[in-house]
Amino acid sequence: YLMESLGMAVIALEIGALSSARAMITAKKEYISEARAILDIGATRSTLIIFDHDHIQFSSSLAYSGEMLTAAISQKLHISYDEAEMKKKTYGLKYQKSKNWAILTKLTDKLVEQIQKTLDFYYSHFQNSNKITHITMCGGGSALKNLDKILSLKLKISSKPGNAWKNLNSPKPIDFDEKKSLRFAKAIGLALRAADNPFFNNDTI
């Protein structure tokens, strides 16, 4: 009704997980006997996406976000939200014995637990599931210093921020900060869909 009232027609509807996967999963690579996970860490929530057998098998929301970490720093150190945001970006996750940073350690440990439970659920409830050999990170929170190292260490799975531009066939180099691009992974994935299925071909799939 809203679109009709604006004089617009819906061409396609797509869940965010599908858009993220289109950008973050290497299109030209064949994943044989292995699976991938995408960890999308946003401002208000995070999502873990399981990609196996050339398809998204399922996704799960996780209680972890950039705003959650910033608010925790602000409350713990009794500083403004903006100052806490600056400290978060500057220092990242200091995974060491620090009273001021202990709250971030606790929140990140809970994230690890949530990811592990999600992976265990996938292995036990999905037939012919392959082992997840890598976690590709995206979203604005994926640039948090040391987070990839902590996840790799705790989960014993290689974890690293991905490249949101890797599936774009462009003759010219992309002049955009790779880390900053990760916050636009969904938008880039949607753009890739449009590039693969031009609207003028009446392809509404």
Feature map (PLM): residue ranges:
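Hydrophobic/aromatic-enriched cytosolic interaction surfaces used to assemble or bind macromolecules
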Residues: 1-205
